[in-house]
From Swiss-Prot:
Protein name in the entry: Stress response UPF0229 protein YhbH
Region feature Disordered, mapped onto this chain: 78-115
Pfam families hit by this protein: DUF444 (PF04285)
Keyword Nucleus: no
UniProt cross-references to NCBIfam families, sorted A to Z: spore_yhbH
Induction profile: By phosphate starvation, via the PhoP/PhoR two-component regulatory system.
Family indicated by similarity: Belongs to the UPF0229 family.
UniProt cross-references to InterPro entries, sorted A to Z: Spore_YhbH, UPF0229
Amino acid sequence: MSQNDSGHFLISEENWSLHRKGFDDQQRHQKKVQEAIKNNLPDLVTEESIIMSNGKDVVKIPIRSLDEYKIRYNYDKNKHVGQGDGESQVGDVVARDGSDKKQGPGKGQGAGDQAGEDYYEAEVSLMDLEEALFKELELPNLQQKERDNIIHTDIEFNDIRKTGLTGNIDKKRTMMSAFKRNAMSGKPSFYPIYPEDLKYKTWNDITKPESKAVVLAMMDTSGSMGVWEKYMARSFFFWMTRFLRTKYETVEIEFIAHHTEARVVSEEDFFSKGESGGTICSSVYRKSLELIDEKYNPARYNIYPFHFSDGDNLTSDNARCVKLVNDIMKKANLFCYGEVNQYNRHSTLMSAYKNVKDEKFKYYILKQKSDVFQALKNFFRNEESGVSHQFS
């Protein structure tokens, strides 16, 4: 604090924008983290440490180091000449290295003589991944059903009153009311504030009906489904389950495992226990129809069946599968089939499903880990966006 010639005191004359430097750097860092998540999302979705975590673990991803701009000493010790006419723009080259660079950063088994880029590992939580992934997903073709007796309640501050709770005082309107009253008496000031100046924000309860929905998660657990195939299927269902429970309050999930026979299992068994035996996929479709008839009336529920298999089905069972899938689609909003086929081998089930022409039928073939992310985007995208059947 200093006193000038006029007798007034100055608190500070410095450029306060410089104090934002730390905040700006933090914002740049967060932006880089979000870019890294977006660029690595297909791989992060199938990261084993996340799939097998308790929801609280973190994963590390590489992010390019953010160095401050500054003049550096030229360790190559080459001569440079830089000149300009005073009209240089941001990004113009000031000087170029005159040396003939035939070497570069080391890569693979070759050794280089140039410095590489600095990277560091940033920790990313499961919540960060969910935020990046789920904003692109939604239940397609969600319809308003009969007898929707579950409502979602929200609160909206949309009214101002002269009485209310102390914690809901609208400071801006209160001070403006006091200023106007004081100005009318010839003393324009925010103070004093009298009880009649107080303004309180009040809210109204907003209710809206939400349509019920059920997702039938069906997974092939037969002997032909190896460790990698089951891991891919469970990775998809892991993210599907978290997505549904995060964005929809009224969605139920039924877990069905099958080999030659199908049975409804607990969520824990679905994600942990393996089985063996042959494959008869029609068994899981019959079980789905039984559940729909017993518990999920199509007039009250949006129905979304998801089936994951390796496609190695009993050949004589394929015709029954096609018939049952058509029966399910008459009651469901959508039918999604995911096939884990890493080596592009012949699939008896996929050969039969290629003849299904119903718009409700969608499939995706997963050949590598990043395809889990693509399958999620393909299945959980609104029909209005023009989704079609896709291969990886």
